[in-house]
Amino acid sequence: MSGHSKWHNIQGRKNAQDAKRGKVFQKLSREIYMAAKSGGPDPDGNPALRMVIDKARSNNMPKDNIQRAIKKAEGGSDEHYDEITYEGYAPGGVAVFVEALTDNKNRTASDVRVAFTRNGGSLGATGSVAYMFDRKGYIVIDRSTTDADEDQVLLDVMDAGGDDLQTSDDAYEIYTDPKQFAEVRDALIKAGYKLADAELTMIPQNTTPVPADKKEQFEHLVEALEDSDDVQNVYTAAADED
């Protein structure tokens, strides 16, 4: 793994989303609903549901909201959302991969296209940038929540089946094969670790610095994509700022 610190970016994104909490909860509700509808309402027997519930909790989503989405799926609602991805480039040639859940593909395609074109980006064809990212399980342990030193954490991560451990001043970042994600997550919890984040994500194989004169446009593009009700995740290959 490169020195790409996803946790730093996640913290910044979550802080920025505080003012948009209602929209974040709406998107999480949609994910919970679809996970419960496709795999059943019991998170113990539905790893996908358990993962999104954990994600909702890490975003401080109220328990009532989580249960409401599950009950909606249990109640036989005929609502359905399709999983769609979009690929393109942000200003400065930075690769962008977008995941959406939508009940109206035309609306979502239009929203995404407008976000790219109005903010100096270009929407590409399917497959144009996906190969530049790797699907990974991603787990974070806040260093302030454990007495274990780095060597012990590394041993526990390896025993759990994790692929890689990165260390920063405030966190341990663990990467896993996506197929082993749930197993690694559960093993670390069983070992006594409190997880600050645990999700499936897309990690860029290489990163691209955002030119100084394109930074504002780049940020506006990401914000415009995240503001879409249908967009669940926006991944970029932008290099971390020093």
From Swiss-Prot:
| The keyword Protein transport is assigned to this record | no
First-listed, main subcellular location of the protein, grouped into a coarse class: cytoplasm
Keyword terms: Cytoplasm, DNA-binding, Transcription, Transcription regulation
Q: Does the keyword Transcription feature in the UniProt annotation?
A: yes
InterPro entries associated with the record: Integrase-like_N (IPR017856), TACO1_YebC-like_2nd/3rd_dom (IPR048300), TACO1_YebC_N (IPR049083), Transcrip_reg_TACO1-like (IPR002876), Transcrip_reg_TACO1-like_dom3 (IPR026564), YebC-like (IPR029072)
Q: Where in the cell is it found?
A: Cytoplasm
Biological process annotations from GO:
regulation of DNA-templated transcription
Report the family membership.
Belongs to the TACO1 family.
In its UniProt entry, what is this protein called?
Probable transcriptional regulatory protein LBA0733
Could you read off the lineage of the organism from its UniProt record? Bacteria, Bacillati, Bacillota, Bacilli, Lactobacillales
